[in-house]
A protein has these predicted regions:
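S-adenosyl-L-methionine-dependent methyltransferase catalytic module, highlighting the catalytic core
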Residues: 3-27, 99-100, 122-237
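Conserved SAM-binding loop
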Residues: 32-153, 228-239
């Protein structure tokens, strides 16, 4: 059985270790909060995939009903359940399969978010997750993922090597192909080989694509940023179009 990380240490490393690291990781939460406020997104019925310890709830208006789904590999879901044990409007579900979304009725959520999670999902399962999300969602979708291609990848690999941080192993050929965006030549393993452009296409196939934004520097194109944020909306049904 895989040993779960110490959650306090994990959060401290992400959000309290140096200004630069905190700025990078907080950018996605700040983006979601700002987008919800600016677009007046309805968050009354909120679904989150990869919720970890429920940190996003600290940055958005409180939903009337919130469902957080997580694989709980790192123990974050245990902490979320403990923190919200007395709040019946918050439901946390441990899940490793898109089949768990089958229990929800169609159009039962007004907003969906998934932060730094899609890159960890098996590519075959990701399609199934998006199919189910498109069914249960009648509203806005917000997804953030890391940028694992282009010149940014070379910078990230160099920084991780300098600071001695753990990183997915690339062959020299894979690193070259990833740096020029030839992701089909890179073996896929979680972050490694993940192509945000393919995810954008998958979302565009199922939703009305609103924007693709680079983070943390929104004035730079996504390919030159560390993180990519995708905003989309449920397509209008024939009934809504007729109305």
């Amino acid at each position: 059985m895989t040993q779960k990380r110490n959650i306090a240490d994990y959060n401290s490393r992400l959000f309290n270790t140096g200004r630069i690291r905190r700025f990078y990781h907080m950018a996605r939460f700040d983006f979601v909060a700002d987008l919800i406020k600016r677009r007046k997104i309805n968050v009354e019925q909120f679904l989150e995939l990869g919720c970890f310890d429920g940190r996003l709830l600290q940055h958005i208006p409180q939903p009337d009903h919130y469902v957080g789904i997580d694989a709980n590999v790192e123990g974050g879901l245990d902490l979320a359940k403990k923190n919200y044990i007395d709040d019946s409007s918050k439901v946390f579900i441990e899940s490793l399969s898109p089949e768990n979304l089958l229990t929800f009725e169609s159009d039962s959520f007004s907003a969906f978010a998934s932060l730094e999670t899609c890159e960890h999902i098996d590519p075959d399962q990701l399609d199934a997750y998006l199919d189910e999300v498109s069914r249960v969602l009648n509203g806005d979708l917000i997804i953030t993922v890391p940028n694992e291609k282009g010149p940014v990848l070379l910078v990230k690999k160099l920084v991780k090597r300098i600071i001695g941080s753990r990183s997915d192993p690339y062959s020299l050929a894979e690193l070259f192909y990833a740096s020029i965006g030839r992701m089909e030549r890179v073996a896929r393993r979680e972050h490694k080989g993940f192509d945000y452009s393919r995810l954008v296409d998958q979302i565009d196939h199922r939703f009305e694509l609103i924007s693709v934004t680079g983070l943390p520097f929104q004035w730079l194109p996504p390919i030159l940023n560390l993180t990519v944020a995708i905003h989309a909306r449920s397509r209008m049904t024939s009934v809504e179009l007729d109305g």
